[in-house]
Amino acid sequence: MKVSYHGHSVVKIETNGKVILIDPFLTGNPKTDLKAEDVKVDAILLSHGHGDHVGDTVELAKKNNAVVVAPFELATFLSWQGVKTHPMHIGGSHEFDFGKVKFTQAFHGSSYIDEENKTITYTGMPAGILFTAEEKTLYHAGDTALFSDMKLIGELNNIDVAFLPIGDNFTMGPEDAVLAAKWVQAKTVVPMHYNTFPVIEQDPYQFVEKLQNCTGKVLEAGESITL
């Protein structure tokens, strides 16, 4: 399984001849190396409904006939826009032809904001994502605060790599993320959701230096690891 980071919270997984994107915020993302028009994808996994995570989902899904796996309310909202979806909810799992997906808890919000009409649409509970293929497991925490049930996620799953937000302000910051890394017990931890905007500026190298009992890995946009 090849796992690539593409800035903010964008993660690409290549496994069994399939390409999976998590939270494909590409257009307007100053930290990504990808252009939406160049992306080929078979499935899109969404952690929640905020614009910096849904991103280019509708365009990508329609162009590639890709299925979008998302929390129920968000999946329903996207299906009304002509997107092929597979709704799930926290605690649920499903075996797809590209791998197994399970949604975990996350402490955050989830909504679609229409600036023009000044409306906010609730898009369900936010989630973390466990993805398993080729006997390897990836944990994408989504946007979240630190929460004690991360210990349970670590106990129940043999996590090979965890992507954890460190930006603070909207999610947990580096200090909380160090504790999260300890609790989820991943072999490798990659920081995400930082330096995209001034309010979430952090030093990822300082973060990985503080990690214990795991390998910390800072990935620049376009860099990858193989599990």
UniProtKB/Swiss-Prot annotation:
The keyword Zinc-finger does not apply. Pfam families: Lactamase_B_2. Keywords: Hydrolase. InterPro entries: Metallo-B-lactamas, RibonucZ/Hydroxyglut_hydro, UPF0173, UPF0173_UPF0282_UlaG_hydrolase. Disulfide bonds: none annotated. GO terms for molecular function: hydrolase activity. NCBIfam families: PRK00685.1 (NF001911). Belongs to the UPF0173 family. PANTHER family: UPF0173 METAL-DEPENDENT HYDROLASE MJ1163, UPF0173 METAL-DEPENDENT HYDROLASE MJ1163-RELATED. This is UPF0173 metal-dependent hydrolase BCE_4747.
